[in-house]
Amino acid sequence: MIEIDNGGAIALKGFNYQKASIILVMIHNFEKDNFIVIPESQEDFEIHLGQDTYFIQVKGTKKLSIGKLKSRPSGKASIIEKNLSPGNVGDIRKIFLWDIAELTKNELISQEGTLIPMKHSLSLKQKTEIINTLDLDEEQKNRMNNQYIYITPFPNDINLALTFLKGEMVNENLLVSNDRAKLVLGELSLEIDRKSEIVVSTESDVERKKIDGNYLKQVFINIKQKEMFDEILDNLSINTIMKKKVKKEKLRIPLLYQNIKEQTKQKADINLLMRENDEGAINYLRDLLVEIVPDMKPTELSIALAIDCFCELGE
């Protein structure tokens, strides 16, 4: 049999697990003040939340033990040492993994987490073993006091991870359906890819890599509005072909008609609008569109614009 190099596939699998871990943290924290994610920076990913900085290393390896965490392969820094290196003494460090040796797991101390519901700290026995083996200095010892282990609720399998994350978003009442959750996961995954590819050589590069809470909030708002758009469109008494054309026109709005949409929203009487059913509300907004743009014909575009306005006014 021909020998096959699986290095690329293994690396991709590891990166997918890393992305799933980032998205899990995003789901639980994006609505908090000053939330920022920086992928592929000083660690696999970096989190800023309020005044705290977290350096997170992600390991998709099976049966990780204290022995493996402190091992120095080919003389290189161990997993523990790498995670202790970046940032300042007071920063928080986490090692995300999915599979841990039973003996190592039994000795960990469980406690309530901040980024995630549950985290684990090393026992005194485990810390002593690591300190002695790696000959850690005083600063490294102090840094290790803020180092924790987190066992993810999904394995190093992207399909199982995505299934869990979709359910998590629905459970957190962020989205009402798995289909919309799938769209969000695609958007977040793509954004993590884009930011990860930015090579850091200056401080401005680090700024470009940031994914902040405002961006994440907008992603969820956009998906919710798309869901609402489809629901309202389904309630209108127009035929299937017209509905398909309306959806097509919607794609043009951000590029060509954003200003008209904003003018319509400003002109709308919210109290009057909220007393109407979907059909009445859309007809009211289409009449406003004609007042703003007299040559706006009663076409699929006017329906798309009116529904888009209605969705945003309802937020």
Swiss-Prot record:
It comes from the Bacteria. Keywords: Antiviral defense. Pfam families: Cap4_nuclease (PF14130). GO terms for biological process: defense response to virus. The keyword Ribonucleoprotein does not apply. Disruption phenotype: When this gene is missing the Lamassu type I system does not confer resistance to SpBeta in B.subtilis. GO terms for molecular function: nuclease activity. Component of antiviral defense system Lamassu type I, composed of LmuA and LmuB. Expression of Lamassu type I in B.subtilis (strain BEST7003) confers resistance to phages phi3T, SpBeta and SPR. This is Lamassu protein LmuA. It comes from Bacillus sp. (strain NCIM 5461 / CCTCC AB 2011126 / NIO-1130). The lineage of its organism: Bacteria, Bacillati, Bacillota, Bacilli, Bacillales.
